[in-house]
């Protein structure tokens, strides 16, 4: 009844949070060079690779793309320049992960990610096009993205080849109105899971995240219209989306029903409405980075109620989240951040209906490692009482909650290559039967082109 699907979200979170540093490391390096020379020196020319950042996808509003200069071979042997001449941009990422419970709980069949040595690999490609070249207004951009995923533990990572983004983004009135329409998953637009991550996903997968339980799409894209309005400062915003829910059967069923990503509808999945109000501020010389948001989800799909086995009228959820830079030792985006999330949904139809998370991460933890990141965090996710009561009626023991504590370090080996090492202690790694605690070693080698 409780099906979980895993992707390396907790490891990807380390890499995505590094983008908060932006070009701060380049700025810091130039300041160091200037201070060592007593006489004025010419301002270094802007790196050519920075010109290609305008072609990075803008479709993923909740995730900041890694700058082109921070990737492997920024020029791609002249390919990026040739594409840019025609209004095109291209990027690719490859995530290659390993997870294993070092406490030695190997078993067949495997019931959670990492119980036996678990491997996964993915390739993500992005192609963008400047639509102003064909008459669209302002900064309109089209994004086409695709993903291949492979793994040896397929209940956690089904082997898929799918489209992930097929959408247009454009803004009006100096970015006070922004539109996103097409196929895209909700996690790329809302919530901000990439900041701080969620320690529970190490063993349970993204289905352990409450908004995904309620129907927000995490992997396969859904047809979406997203309208973002901002005040004149561009800091306060409201983001409202009409989209399709994932299958009420869960993420794995949604992948089965929509393997290509292009399906307009899937069985039993109806309209989902998402609204997020927030305040977002980038780091500057005088201000710390901050992002506070509150969101609600209303799903018109009919879910099977655990106790009655009847169909519900709807499903809904809400979340509060905040990410705040609390130190700025070098006057830029580097430093310590605190991230917290609080999620809620009804326990009549959602297997995990409440969660609370706290994370602290440090971008640029050492003066000579400005592109690294260190993170520690804890997540407590609560299983539905109504679902536990159903299992108790059959004499089956179940966990009340799962508690996961994680620590990780992301090291930039060279521009565009990151090694992320993590250790996650998980109390109750499965719902039923009650299982011994797990200590998951996670390694991920990531390549960004």
Question: Residue ranges of each PLM-predicted region?
Answer:
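Outer membrane beta-barrel transmembrane domains
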Residues: 249-267, 272, 276-278, 296-312, ...
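Outer-membrane beta-barrel architecture
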Residues: 78-80, 126-128, 167-169, 226-228, ...
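Outer-membrane beta-barrel "beta-signal"
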Residues: 437-449
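Surface-exposed loop and membrane-interface regions of Gram-negative outer-membrane beta-barrel proteins
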Residues: 99-121, 133-172, 265, 429-431
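Short loop/turn motifs that connect adjacent beta-strands in outer-membrane beta-barrel proteins
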Residues: 30-32, 67, 73-90, 102, ...
């Amino acid at each position: 009844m409780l099906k979980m699907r895993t992707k390396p979200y907790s490891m990807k979170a380390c890499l995505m949070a590094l983008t908060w540093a932006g070009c701060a490391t380049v700025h810091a390096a130039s300041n160091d060079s200037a201070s060592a020379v007593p006489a004025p020196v010419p301002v270094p020319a802007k790196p050519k690779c920075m010109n290609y950042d305008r072609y990075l996808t803008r479709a993923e509003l909740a995730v900041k793309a890694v700058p082109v200069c921070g990737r492997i071979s920024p020029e791609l042997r002249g390919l990026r320049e040739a594409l840019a001449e025609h209004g095109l941009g291209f990027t690719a990422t490859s995530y290659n992960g390993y997870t294993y419970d070092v406490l030695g709980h190997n078993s067949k069949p495997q019931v959670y990610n990492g119980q036996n040595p678990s491997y996964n690999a993915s390739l993500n490609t992005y192609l963008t096009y400047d639509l102003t070249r064909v008459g669209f207004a302002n900064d309109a951009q089209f994004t086409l993205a695709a993903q291949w995923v492979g793994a040896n533990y397929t209940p956690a990572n089904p082997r898929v080849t799918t489209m992930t983004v097929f959408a247009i983004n454009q803004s009006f009135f100096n970015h006070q109105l922004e539109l996103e329409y097409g196929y895209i998953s909700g996690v790329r637009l809302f919530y901000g899971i990439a900041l701080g991550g969620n320690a529970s996903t190490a063993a349970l997968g993204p289905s352990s995240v409450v908004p995904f339980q309620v129907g927000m799409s995490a992997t396969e894209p859904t047809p979406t219209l997203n309208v973002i309005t901002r005040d004149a400062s561009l800091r306060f915003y409201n983001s409202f989306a009409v989209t399709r829910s994932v299958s009420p059967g869960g993420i794995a069923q949604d992948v089965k029903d929509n393997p290509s990503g292009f399906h307009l509808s899937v069985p039993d999945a109806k309209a989902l409405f998402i609204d997020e109000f927030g305040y977002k501020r980038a780091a500057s010389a005088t201000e710390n980075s901050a992002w506070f948001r509150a969101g609600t989800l209303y799903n018109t799909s009919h879910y099977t109620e655990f106790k009655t086995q009847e169909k519900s009228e709807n499903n809904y959820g809400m979340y509060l989240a905040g990410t705040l830079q609390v130190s700025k030792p070098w006057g830029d985006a580097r430093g310590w951040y605190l991230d917290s999330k609080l999620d809620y949904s009804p326990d009549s139809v959602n297997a995990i209906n409440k969660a609370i998370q706290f994370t602290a991460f440090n971008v640029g933890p050492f003066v000579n490692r400005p592109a690294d990141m260190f993170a520690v965090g804890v997540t407590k996710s609560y299983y539905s009482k109504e679902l536990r009561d159903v299992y108790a009626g059959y004499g089956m023991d179940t966990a009340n909650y799962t508690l996961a504590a994680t620590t990780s370090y992301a090291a930039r080996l060279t521009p565009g290559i990151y090694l992320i090492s993590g250790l996650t202690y998980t109390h109750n790694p499965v719902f039923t039967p009650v299982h011994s605690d797990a200590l998951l070693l996670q390694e991920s080698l990531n390549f960004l082109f």
